[in-house]
Amino acid sequence: MPLWGASTSDESKPKNLTAEEKSRTFATTRGWEIRRPDGTDEVIVAIRNLSAAEKLAAATISQVFFTANSYSTGATGTVRVVWNERVTPTTTGTLVVTRSDTSATITATRNGNGGPNYVNFNFTAPSTTGVTLTIGAQTITMGINDYGSTTVTSDLTIATADVNAANVDGGSTSVVTTA
């Protein structure tokens, strides 16, 4: 079994990385790169000839998670969507956060550009304590392209398997509101 993928059918991140490291890792024409804490990018797997379309397809979502384990009532919460390649948002965007106490949903709105391979969406936590918030399968309403391209549209569909956050920046796949 290969330790990483480098084709349009398998753009999998290096398997030896932690979940937190994977959230900072993305494919470029040089190979797999990781964003270091100082803000620089480091090639961790060098792969040649990745610029052709048969190697790097449109960026796909690899992780979706809340950036905290809980939010105080009325606080600003954040959902982070991570792609497997660098991306460039082209329009504002939204996604839906589901509440456990009602059938109502909360709209999270894109907050800036995020990072090289992720976008943050902010929302206001409900004013009721003990409400569990989750992220379900959905399509993000937003314009986004692969980095450096104006013609390759990146994936905007969140699958249930994309919602994962094990040990990512203290994040979680569901959160509970607290007082």
Where do the PLM segments sit?
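Non-catalytic beta-sheet/beta-sandwich ligand-binding modules that flank or precede catalytic cores
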Residues: 1-179
